[in-house]
UniProtKB/Swiss-Prot annotation:
InterPro entries: ADH-like_C, ADH-like_N, ADH_Zn_CS, GroES-like_sf, NAD(P)-bd_dom_sf, PKS_ER. Its cofactor is Zn(2+). Multimeric (with different ratios of monomers). In Z.mobilis there are two isozymes of alcohol dehydrogenase. It comes from Zymomonas mobilis subsp. mobilis (strain ATCC 31821 / ZM4 / CP4). It catalyses: a primary alcohol + NAD(+) = an aldehyde + NADH + H(+); a secondary alcohol + NAD(+) = a ketone + NADH + H(+). PROSITE patterns: ADH_ZINC. This is Alcohol dehydrogenase 1. Binds 2 Zn(2+) ions per subunit. Belongs to the zinc-containing alcohol dehydrogenase family. Its EC number is 1.1.1.1.
Length: 337
């Protein structure tokens, strides 16, 4: 089968490879689509260690082709997912308390185990979430990562209907955060991005206010116009966005961090204490979060913007990603092989 494999010089080689036989509790998916995520870029570039030889990809949707011994949660013919959260240990304090993505022995698709950017992929059946009927698999691929990540982040922000949520970064993650915030949580949304194209798209999606921080001070405007945001979700990978988010929040507000810039953020301790501000990290989502995120997409409340590409274009896609050359998500199409 054809697979996108990480090489030692930090590129991707599309080559023929064979998967091992299924073990107890596993299923084999015939892949339909696999989205390309910024995390794949980090893994490919060796930012998390040398992963030479690993099949990349963790935004996969496929049809169950075969199930191993002991599988009860999936059957042949089901459409199911391959996500970054590939499996947890199942018995630690995090796994048993609904915080499974924080499991210290977690496996991640396309990083610690072979991923979904291939014609076939092995999953642990109990950790592979079924896709609801009527949800386009290309669209579903974006929900497995970008969708569930932003849905969970908005959930963690504890935003209430009619409250102001400021979203920093309106790329592949941010535009979905905006849709979940508006169409599921019924919040008022402020979109902040340095790219006017992304802001125009945010406006189309129903943003109540858009700000380009290159031209104006986002935090100052948010404080002046609405008295500060009730919560902020930061998907941008710039330290300046995190610092602005803290300044843009009102007393008692929450800053939810999603993007991963390498630097440290500045945090005024008196502001934190005297204004009772919370700063929280939110990492992807649990299986239950993904099930909910899929359902809202199936109901048409969230529509990821996806562009289908061939697996042979994978290095070009990563190059475009590094230079911020596209809006929405790029999805590799395996349905025509």
């Amino acid at each position: 089968m054809k697979a996108a494999v990480i090489t030692k010089d930090h590129t991707i080689e599309v080559k023929d490879t064979k998967l091992r036989p299924l073990k107890y509790g596993e299923a084999l998916l015939e892949m339909e689509y696999c989205g390309v995520c910024h995390t794949d870029l980090h893994v490919k570039n060796g930012d998390f260690g040398d992963e030479t030889g690993r099949i990349t990809g963790h935004e996969g949707i496929g049809i169950v082709k075969q199930v191993g011994e002991g599988v009860t949660s999936l059957k042949v013919g089901d459409r199911a997912s391959v996500a970054w959260f590939f499996k947890g240990c199942g018995h630690c304090e995090y796994c048993v308390s609904g915080n499974e993505t924080l499991c210290r022995n977690v496996e991640n698709a396309g990083y610690t185990v072979d991923g979904a950017m291939a014609e076939e992929c092995i999953v642990v059946a109990d950790y592979s979430v079924k896709v609801p009927d009527g949800l386009d698999p290309a669209v579903a691929s974006s929900i497995t990562c970008a969708g569930v990540t932003t849905y969970k982040a908005v959930k963690v922000s504890q935003i209430q209907p009619g409250q102001w949520l400021a979203i920093y970064g309106l790329g592949g993650l941010g535009n979905l955060a905006l849709q979940y915030a508006k169409n599921v949580f019924n919040a008022k949304v402020i979109a902040i991005d340095v790219n006017d194209e992304q802001l125009a798209f945010a406006k189309e999606l129903g943003a109540d206010m858009v700000i380009n921080p290159k031209n104006e001070d986002a935090a100052k405007i948010i404080q002046e116009k609405v008295g500060g945001a009730h919560a902020t979700v930061v998907t941008a990978v710039a330290k300046s966005a995190f610092n602005s988010a803290v300044e843009a929040i009102r007393a008692g507000g929450r800053v939810v961090a999603v993007g991963l810039p390498p630097e440290k953020m500045d945090l005024s301790i008196p502001r934190l204490v005297l204004d009772g501000i919370e700063v929280l990290g939110s990492l992807v989502g649990t299986r239950e979060d993904l099930k909910e995120a899929f359902q809202f997409a199936a109901e048409g409340k969230v529509k990821p913007k996806v562009t289908k590409r061939k697996v042979e274009e994978i290095n070009q896609i990563f190059d475009e990603m590094e230079h911020g050359k596209f809006t929405g998500r790029m999805v590799v199409d395996f349905t025509h092989h």
